[in-house]
């Protein structure tokens, strides 16, 4: 990433001795195309992970879709802890390519990548919606808003999905304070 990256640091620890992870095949392709991103460590099963800034998320997602990553398997969020960052992730698969490959070789390796956007919890975290690229992002982005308070610019239905409309706060944030009592209105 460039020196002007908007990805907030994970903590205040000295990271000068940390070696950057090797770029995987998708990260290398993004570098060749001139996209700014950050290669992250692969996850526990070896899936390539890439950090991107919120501003370039739709551009990189569109580039990956045009490069065969045509299926959003999962989108979600998580909280790294009180005072730490919020994270949105997007797990993309090359599904059409995989189906064709499996027709001739059932053991064909699936191409997949996980994009991560790191957000500061200060103020209102906002990301551009990728609903226009992947329709499956609809309820997944709404759930992430509902549980973590991350807003998605350009989403056609920006409202709570699971919690009542008048709910205060974001229940899956680690700094969330549970209300003593919440009275549900009669359903009829």
Curated annotation (Swiss-Prot):
Reactions catalysed, as given in the entry: a plastoquinone + NADH + (n+1) H(+)(in) = a plastoquinol + NAD(+) + n H(+)(out); a plastoquinone + NADPH + (n+1) H(+)(in) = a plastoquinol + NADP(+) + n H(+)(out)
Cellular localisation: Cellular thylakoid membrane
GO biological process, any: photosynthesis, light reaction
Keyword Translocase: yes
GO MF assignments: NADH dehydrogenase (ubiquinone) activity; quinone binding
InterPro entries: NADH_DH_suC, NADH_quin_OxRdtase_su_C/D-like, NADH_UbQ_OxRdtase_30kDa_su, NADH_UbQ_OxRdtase_CS
Superkingdom of source: Bacteria
Family annotation (Pfam families): Complex1_30kDa
GO CC term (a single one): plasma membrane-derived thylakoid membrane
Keywords noted in UniProt: Membrane, NAD, NADP, Plastoquinone, Quinone, Thylakoid, Translocase, Transport
Claim: Membrane is one of the keywords in the record: yes
Broad enzyme group: translocase
Location (main, coarse): membrane
Topology in membrane: Peripheral membrane protein
Enzyme Commission identifier(s): 7.1.1.-
NCBIfam families reported in the protein's UniProt record: PRK12494.1 (NF009141)
Subunit structure: NDH-1 can be composed of about 15 different subunits; different subcomplexes with different compositions have been identified which probably have different functions.
Function description: NDH-1 shuttles electrons from an unknown electron donor, via FMN and iron-sulfur (Fe-S) centers, to quinones in the respiratory and/or the photosynthetic chain. The immediate electron acceptor for the enzyme in this species is believed to be plastoquinone. Couples the redox reaction to proton translocation, and thus conserves the redox energy in a proton gradient. Cyanobacterial NDH-1 also plays a role in inorganic carbon-concentration.
UniProt family annotation: Belongs to the complex I 30 kDa subunit family.
Protein name: NAD(P)H-quinone oxidoreductase subunit J
């Amino acid at each position: 990433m460039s020196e002007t990256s908007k990805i907030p640091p994970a903590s205040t620890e000295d990271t000068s001795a940390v070696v950057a992870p090797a770029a995987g095949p998708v990260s290398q392709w993004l570098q060749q195309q001139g996209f700014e991103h950050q290669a992250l460590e692969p996850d526990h099963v070896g899936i390539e992970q890439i950090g991107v800034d919120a501003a370039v998320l739709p551009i990189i997602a569109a580039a990956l879709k045009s490069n065969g990553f045509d299926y959003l398997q999962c989108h979600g969020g998580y909280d790294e802890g009180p005072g730490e960052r919020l994270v949105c992730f997007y797990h993309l698969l090359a599904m059409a390519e995989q189906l064709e490959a499996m027709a001739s070789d059932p053991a064909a390796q699936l191409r997949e990548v996980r994009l991560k956007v790191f957000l500061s919890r200060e103020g209102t975290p906002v990301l551009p919606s990728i609903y226009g690229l992947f329709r499956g992002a609809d309820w997944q982005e709404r759930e992430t808003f509902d549980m973590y308070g991350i807003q998605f610019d350009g989403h056609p239905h920006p409202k709570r999905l699971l919690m009542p409309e008048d709910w205060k706060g974001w229940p899956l944030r680690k700094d969330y304070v549970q209300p003593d009592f919440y009275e549900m209105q009669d359903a009829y």
